[in-house]
A protein has these predicted regions:
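Transmembrane-helix signature of 12-pass secondary carriers
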Residues: 1-222
Length: 222
């Protein structure tokens, strides 16, 4: 109901805010920040200690913060997918990763039902809110070794850093026993730092350049 709507509103705000921050600070850094925001917000939700107005506001506020973290997650993740995954695999990878949102919602629902039936209701719903933060802690350790997006680095003039990131990725591929074919120089594209674009450019892109896609995307979320 209203709590889910607040969470969704937080996702929208988080996607806009952290998406822009991701363009400035990098995908890898935002992977850690947004996950930390979600962990903080969702973890605090479990510590709502009453039903009076103050605690209800606290619960809504923490769910909004958790939603911001998830919205920022998808902004950073989808940017990284677009920049690092080859075009012929990009759609499948995108569906697979974004599909985990709905898979996680289903798993979380059944887990919450389990907790509510096994433990007292006052404890069961809190445990449901703590599932996500516990998984987030594990994911933080996994993400520590992720390289920065070489394309993002090139767009920000970090040529040496981009080459180092590519070397790291290629080393991991070779470690798994795969051979990399030489790159055809004729397929190379020139990349250089671009101008900084704000929210006004985004609005024009959505409602002037691609209005049908904007309506379709909004309809799917509703």
């Amino acid at each position: 109901g209203a709590l889910a709507s607040v969470y969704l509103a937080g996702e929208v705000v988080g996607a806009l805010f952290f998406g822009r921050l991701s363009d400035r600070l990098g995908r890898r850094r935002l992977f850690m920040i947004t996950l930390g925001v979600y962990l903080f917000g969702s973890g605090l939700s479990a510590f709502t200690l009453g039903t009076d107005t103050g605690w209800i506001i606290f619960l809504y506020a923490t769910r909004f913060v958790a939603g911001m973290g998830i919205g920022g997650e998808y902004a950073a993740i989808n940017s990284a997918i677009d920049e690092m995954i080859p075009a012929r695999y990009r759609g499948r990878v995108d569906v697979g990763i974004n599909g985990t949102y709905w898979a996680g919602a289903i798993i979380g629902t059944f887990a919450s039902l389990f907790f509510l039936n096994v433990f007292a209701p006052s404890l069961g719903w809190r445990l449901g809110f703590l599932i996500g933060p516990l998984l987030a802690i594990v994911i933080i350790f996994v993400r520590r070794t992720l390289p920065e997006s070489p394309r993002w680095q090139l767009m920000h003039g970090q040529v040496e850093e981009a080459n180092a990131s590519i070397d790291q990725i290629e080393a991991e591929v070779r470690k798994d026993g795969y051979e990399l074919s030489p790159v055809d120089d004729s397929m190379a594209i020139e990349m250089k730092p671009g101008d900084d674009h704000g929210y006004w450019t985004l609005l024009k892109l959505l409602f002037t350049t691609y209005p049908r896609r904007a309506v379709l995307g909004a309809s799917l979320m509703i």
